[in-house]
């Protein structure tokens, strides 16, 4: 990798602790800003006269945008222009947030959500790589550069141990920050109106742009050639169309009476045609956008299956929201406050995962423990509902489920990427997000809602 200025990406007058705080602060809008906010869903539905499926579909569109970015991960990491990418990314997110706050078009809302999901992943990865370089003095891209794989079995074992410790810490940080963002949006909706969530986030984006202007100097490209082939954005578009059609069918199927509705029929045809076209293009290209060879790896297939089971099971968390919302008459703010207990579960699960992984506990026992926690949470809910349920006791299934979620969330990628060549990493992350955030949740929601 090329050399960077001593205090990259900041001016030399910026103290290192302040720079670290700034980079951490940037994660708040990156992880929180979106086309829709679940915590303000009820108020948004009543304000716009829309149904809950519209909110779900927009949320899935955000996840599709995030997955569509992943094959560009390594090439984006090579650009390394924090100031340019933060200003451009935050500015575009500001524009899309403004459109989402003003529009009553579901199509426009979903389209902006998709773009914002793509931008979220761009900014998240750029900021994460920069933070690791700035605070940890480590070049993260070296750990994902094809050709830098360990050459011996001991080297791979050491890498697996490092991942077992690092990935739970990273997941813990992102999941806790995401929950804090949910609580913030719920509070804003409760105290003001749902539109004010967008306006607050727009103000936060402007603040981040201002801080970027003041604290970061201009940096030239570190390579002669721009690393991203813009032709592959066409492939990414077909990928997005395929997943959007699938999620449309699964989200609106019950409301529109499935295949009695022509839009469901056309969406199915669109998913099949776009899916076949995407596979054909990727298989025949010399430098594909998505490498299907990643699915030939046994650990990747198991990771795919585990994530699918995990997210289908986790979709049952909707029963907690239904019970607290309808049965206990709680509003979104109280639900979000109750959801804050998940941070305790994340912390317990994260610490336990790191400790047990370093101790060398076999994956099968850790996976069994994770799914056991999910089962215990569902069992607790069953008996609690039978006993009419108390608000004070609803925190226990949330803590138990989030502990199991943290165990599985952080361990499945570690298991799936064992001995995996780095050239497949971007395609694996795309597969992981597609299953974890799009396909499995949409299928799970369709199953439970029917």
Where are these regions (language model features)?
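12-transmembrane solute porter fold
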Residues: 17-31, 38-39, 289-449
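Structural signature of the two symmetry-related core transmembrane helices
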Residues: 84-99, 107, 365-380
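Intracellular juxtamembrane helix-capping segments at the cytosolic ends
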Residues: 122-157, 407-421
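Paired small-residue
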Residues: 107-116, 392-400
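Glycine-rich segments within core transmembrane alpha-helices of 12-TM secondary carriers
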Residues: 143-183, 433-445
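Hydrophobic transmembrane-helix bundles of small-molecule transporters
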Residues: 190-305
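Helix-breaking motifs and short loop linkers at transmembrane-helix boundaries and internal kinks
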Residues: 49, 81, 100-108, 119, ...
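Extracytoplasmic
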Residues: 3, 13-74, 123-124, 128, ...
